[in-house]
Amino acid sequence: MTDAVKVGFVPLSTAPKGVLVVFTDESMKFGPASRKHLVNAGDVVKRAAAAAEFKGKSGSALDILAPQGVKAARLIVVGTGKAGSVKDEDFIKLGGTATGKIGSNASAVTLVAELPGGAMKPHQAAALAVGARLRGYKFDRYKTKTKDKDKALVAQFSVAVADVAAARKAFIRDAHVANGVVLARELVNEPPNVLYPAEFARRAAQLRKLGVKVEIFDVKAMEKLGMGALLGVSQGSYHPGRMVVMRWNGASNKADKPVAFVGKGVCFDTGGISIKPAGSMEEMKGDMAGAACVVGLMHALAARKAKVNAVGAIGIVENMPDGNAQRPGDIVKTMSGQTIEIINTDAEGRLVLADVLWYVTQKHKPKFIVDLATLTGAILVALGTEYAGLFSNNDQLSERLSKSGDATGERVWRMPLGPEFDKQIDSKFADMKNAAGRWGGSITAAQLLQRFVDNTPWAHLDIAGTAMGAPATDINTSWGSGYGVRLLDHLVAQHYETKR
C-alpha cells in the first residue's frame, strides 16, 4: 500500500510550495487569497484556460506551469461548476479531483481552501483534505517495478484555511473515517493466498489497539453454536472458517443497546461444486468486501471515539470445490434451528450471513442490524455500479440510510420485499432453499436473510456493484473501493450517537 498524502493546515496567506491548487467556478473568478497568490498572473491564467477550453465546470481542471511571479512550480485550477452551486458533499470530490491532476512527481502541494465567494468553512476544508487522502491511496505492495506514471503520489499537502485550529479539529475526526476506508480497501485488494480466513481474523483483531473488544470463533466454537450453514460453506476449504465479533462501547450508558453491522467475508469464492466460469474468477477475492467494510467501520468508530455502542460481526470462509465440499442437495441446520436445502453452492453468502445474523440478533439484541454483502450478480443487472441495493423491514432505517447515502455519495436504492418473493425460497425437503428461480435473484436472496433477523429492524445492502471493480471516481481509483464505511459512519453519527 502507498497511502502517503500527508495533510497539514496553514493560514490562507502562507506562501505556496511545489504545486499550487486554487478553485474557481464558471465565472472564472478567484477568491481574495487566491488572487494574492496569483499576483498579476490572472491574464495568463485566463489565456491558458481559453486555449485549453477550461471553463470552470465541475470536475474539470487546468494544469499549467506556474506563471512568472507565482511562488510555485505548477498551478492547478479546479472547476466547481456554476457559482454558488457547491454543496457540502462536493468538497471531498474537489479534493480528489485536484489530487488526481497532481501526478506522482510532486513532493509539496498547497491547496487554497477558498471559493470565489470566500474561504471554505472548516468542515469543508477538512473534506477537501480527506478527498485528497482517499484519492492518493494506491495498492502497490506487490509491485517490484513501477513506471513513473504508475507511481503513487507521495507528498505533503498544506491546506490553506481561514481558521487553522477549527479545520484541523474537523479533519482529525474525518481522517479516522478515511483510515477506515483505506483499511477496507486494503483488505479487499489483498490476494486470496495472503488473506485467508485466519489471516483476516488476525487483522481484525488488531482493532484491539483502539479499544475494540474482539472475539474470534473457530470451527469448534461455531459447531458448539450450531452454525451449520456457515460451516457447510467452509468445509471444502483447507483454510477453516472463522467468525469475528467486534464490540465498541462508546456510549455514556454502557448498557445501551448497540447498533450492529454484519459482513459477508468469503475470502475466495470458486462457487464450490457449482463452480464458476474461469473468466474473471480472480475477482472473487473481493467477495469479502462486506466484511472488510464492517472492519473498516469499526476502526472508524473506535478511532474517533464515537459515542455509541456498536457490534460488528463477520463470517469468514472460503468456498472451494474439495472432495469434502458441500453438495447441491445437502440440507444444513442453521443456528436458529431452521434448515436450508442447498440448491446451488454458489449461493453461499446468504448461508454465511444467516448464522451470523442470528447470532447477533439473539446475543446482542441490537437497535438495528445492517448487513453488507457482495451477494448477487443480479443487483448489478438491476442497479449497475452507482447504487447498492437496499432491502429493509423498517422504513425509518431505510430512509436514514438513503439520506446518508446521498450525503456521502455512497448511494443506495431501495428494492422490494414481500410474501410473493418469500414463498419462492420454500423447499420441499427443508424449511427453505438457498436459491430460487432465475428472476428477482437479489430479492429472493434478501428474503432468506430476513428469516434470520427475528423482529429486529434490519437492512441488507447488496454491494456487489459498488465495492469492487467499480469505475474510478473522484476519490477512488482503487479496485476495492471501501464502499460503505463512510455511509454507515454518517448513519451512526447523525442518528445514534449519545449527545453530550
Curated annotation (Swiss-Prot):
Cofactor note: Binds 2 manganese ions per subunit.
Cellular localisation: Cytoplasm
Known cofactor(s): Mn(2+)
Principal location: cytoplasm
Superkingdom of the organism of origin: Bacteria
Keywords: Aminopeptidase, Cytoplasm, Hydrolase, Manganese, Metal-binding, Protease
Catalytic activity: Release of an N-terminal amino acid, Xaa-|-Yaa-, in which Xaa is preferably Leu, but may be other amino acids including Pro although not Arg or Lys, and Yaa may be Pro. Amino acid amides and methyl esters are also readily hydrolyzed, but rates on arylamides are exceedingly low; Release of an N-terminal amino acid, preferentially leucine, but not glutamic or aspartic acids
Enzyme Commission numbers on file: 3.4.11.1, 3.4.11.10
Record: residues binding Mn(2+) 2: 264, 269, 287, 348
UniProt GO MF annotations: manganese ion binding; metalloaminopeptidase activity
InterPro entries: Leucine_aapep/pepB, Macro_dom-like, Peptidase_M17_C, Peptidase_M17_leu_NH2_pept, Peptidase_M17_N
Active site: 276, 350
GO cellular component, one term: cytoplasm
Residues reported to bind Mn(2+) 1: 269, 346, 348
Listed GO biological process terms: proteolysis
HAMAP family: Cytosol_peptidase_M17
Stated role: Presumably involved in the processing and regular turnover of intracellular proteins. Catalyzes the removal of unsubstituted N-terminal amino acids from various peptides.
Cited NCBIfam families: PRK00913.1-2 (NF002073), PRK00913.1-4 (NF002074), PRK00913.2-2 (NF002075), PRK00913.2-4 (NF002077)
Family of the protein in this entry: Belongs to the peptidase M17 family.
PANTHER family assigned to the protein according to its UniProt record, in alphabetical order: CYTOSOL AMINOPEPTIDASE, LEUCINE AMINOPEPTIDASE-RELATED
Name assigned to this protein: Probable cytosol aminopeptidase
Organism in which the protein naturally occurs: Afipia carboxidovorans (strain ATCC 49405 / DSM 1227 / KCTC 32145 / OM5)
Gene from which this protein is expressed: pepA
